[in-house]
C-alpha cells in the first residue's frame, strides 16, 4: 500500500470509491467537493493505493485552529487491513507538522463501526452539537 497526495488523474476513481463506501449524499456534489479541496490545502487530500488502484481516501483540512477529516473511506474489499488507520495517521502527521493542536472528525451517529475504529485510535466523543448551514447549493448528485 502506498499513501500519497491526490492527483488530478485520481478524480473519477475517487468518486467511484466514495460510491462504494456510501459516502455520497444527494446534497453534496463530489466533483465540486474535490474541486474546492484542490483550491485549498490539496496536500491534505490523501489516497491509499494498492497495485495502481485507489482503495482509500481521506480529505483533511486545517484552519489554523483545528484540523478536520472528511471523506475517509476504504473500499469494502480492503477493509479490516489497517488502511483507514494508515490514512488517518498520515493526516495526523501532516497536521502536526503544521502545528495543528487538535483534529475534529464528524461521523454519522449510527456508524458504530467507524466510531469504534476512531475510539481505538484514542479519539473521544465530544459533548458538542454540530450545526451547519448550506451557503452554496450544489447540484444534486
From Swiss-Prot:
Matches recorded under Pfam families: Acetyltransf_1 (PF00583)
SUPFAM superfamilies the record matches: Acyl-CoA N-acyltransferases (Nat)
Broad class of enzyme this protein falls into: transferase
Alphabetic keyword roster: Acyltransferase, Transferase
Species of provenance: Yersinia enterocolitica serotype O:8 / biotype 1B (strain NCTC 13174 / 8081)
EC number: 2.3.1.-
GO molecular function terms attached to this record: acyltransferase activity, transferring groups other than amino-acyl groups
PANTHER family the record matches: ABC SUPERFAMILY TRANSPORT PROTEIN, N-ACETYLTRANSFERASE
Domain of life: Bacteria
Name listed for the protein in its UniProt record: Acetyltransferase YE1169
Entry similarity comment: Belongs to the acetyltransferase family. YpeA subfamily.
Domain N-acetyltransferase: 1-141
Amino acid at each position: 500500500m502506498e499513501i500519497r497526495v491526490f492527483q488530478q488523474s485520481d478524480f473519477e476513481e475517487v468518486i467511484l470509491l466514495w460510491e462504494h463506501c456510501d459516502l455520497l449524499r444527494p446534497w453534496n456534489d463530489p466533483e465540486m467537493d474535490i474541486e474546492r479541496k484542490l483550491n485549498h490545502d490539496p496536500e491534505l487530500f490523501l489516497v491509499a493505493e494498492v497495485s495502481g488502484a485507489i482503495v482509500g481516501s481521506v480529505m483533511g483540512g486545517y484552519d489554523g485552529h483545528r484540523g478536520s477529516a472528511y471523506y475517509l473511506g476504504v473500499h469494502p474489499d480492503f477493509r479490516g487491513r489497517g488502511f483507514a488507520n494508515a490514512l488517518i495517521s498520515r493526516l495526523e502527521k501532516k497536521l502536526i507538522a503544521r502545528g495543528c493542536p487538535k483534529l475534529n472528525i464528524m461521523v454519522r451517529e449510527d456508524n458504530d463501526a467507524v466510531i469504534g475504529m476512531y475510539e481505538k485510535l484514542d479519539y473521544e466523543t465530544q459533548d458538542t452539537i454540530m450545526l451547519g448551514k448550506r451557503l452554496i447549493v450544489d447540484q444534486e448528485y
